[in-house]
A protein has these predicted regions:
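Sec-dependent signal peptide recognition
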Residues: 2-9
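N-terminal signal peptide c-region/cleavage motif recognized by signal peptidases
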Residues: 13-17
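Electrostatic cytochrome c docking/interface patches
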Residues: 18-34, 46-51, 104-132, 153
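The feature marks the first
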Residues: 25-73, 77
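Sequence context surrounding c-type heme c attachment/ligation sites in exported
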Residues: 28-38, 60, 64-65, 123-139, ...
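The canonical Cys-X-X-Cys-His
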Residues: 34-44, 95, 135-144, 198
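Axial heme c-ligation environment in periplasmic c-type cytochrome domains
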Residues: 48-54, 70-114, 149-154, 173-206
Length: 206
C-alpha cells in the first residue's frame, strides 16, 4: 500500500513539473507594459526602420534611464513622450527587463595580432578618436566592439538613420541628459560627413 501511494505521488509531481514554463518560454512572453513598444521596435527589439531603433542588446540601465528622460521631458520626441507616460508602476522595469534580455548578434572587431586593422578615417575615429580636436574614440565609452554597457548604448548593428539623427540632436542641443554633457561636446566636434560615415560604419558592424 505504501508503494502505491509513493508511485501516485511521484506521478503527480512529475505532471506538475512538466506544466512549468521553461525559461525560454518565459523570455518570449511579451509583458503587458511592452506590448505597445513592439509595433515600432519589434517583438524581439530588433527595431523597425524608420519607426523605431533597435533595443535588443541595450542594457537594462540605459533603457530605463531613457524612458525616465522621456517621462520627465529631458529627452523629447513626439511619439516616445506619450508612450513613456503610459508606463506606470513597474512598467519601466517590465519594458527595460524584457528588451535588455533579448539577444543581439556578437560583434568582433577585425584584429591582426594585437592591433585593430583600420581601413579608413572613419574607423580611426571609432577606435582611436582625433585628439588634435579633443575627440575621444567612440569605443572609449561604447566598448571595444561597440556593444555598449550601463548608461552607454550599443552602437553595433543599430540603424544608421537613428545613430545619425541622435548625433545631430546632440549637436543641435535638442537631445540632453548625457553624462557631464559628453555626447553634446563630441557631436559638436564632428562634421556632417563624419556623422554620416560613423552612423553607417556602426550600423554595418555585425
Amino acid at each position: 500500500m505504501k508503494i502505491k501511494t509513493f508511485v501516485i505521488g511521484l506521478t503527480l509531481c512529475s505532471g506538475y513539473a512538466a506544466a512549468e514554463p521553461s525559461d525560454k518560454q518565459s523570455m518570449n512572453v511579451i509583458p503587458q507594459a511592452a506590448q505597445l513598444c513592439v509595433s515600432c521596435h519589434g517583438a524581439a527589439g530588433e527595431g523597425i526602420e524608420p519607426l523605431g531603433p533597435r533595443l535588443a542588446g541595450l542594457s537594462k540601465e540605459y533603457i530605463s534611464t531613457q524612458l525616465q528622460h522621456f517621462q520627465a521631458g529631458v529627452r523629447q520626441n513626439a511619439t516616445m513622450m506619450p508612450m513613456a507616460m503610459t508606463l506606470q508602476g513597474d512598467g519601466i522595469e517590465q519594458v527595460s527587463s524584457y528588451f535588455s534580455a533579448k539577444p543581439a548578434n556578437d560583434v568582433k572587431p577585425v584584429i591582426r595580432g594585437e592591433q585593430v586593422v583600420f581601413n579608413d578615417d572613419t574607423a580611426r575615429l571609432a577606435y582611436q578618436g582625433d585628439w588634435s580636436r579633443g575627440l575621444p574614440a567612440c569605443v572609449t565609452c561604447h566598448g571595444p566592439s561597440a556593444l555598449g554597457g550601463g548608461l552607454f548604448p550599443r552602437l553595433a548593428g543599430q540603424q544608421a538613420s537613428y545613430i545619425k539623427t541622435q548625433l545631430l540632436a546632440w549637436q543641435s542641443g535638442t537631445r540632453k541628459g548625457d553624462v557631464d554633457g559628453m555626447m553634446g561636446s563630441v557631436a559638436n566636434k564632428l562634421t556632417v560627413a563624419e556623422i554620416d560615415a560613423l552612423a553607417n560604419y556602426f550600423a554595418n558592424l555585425k
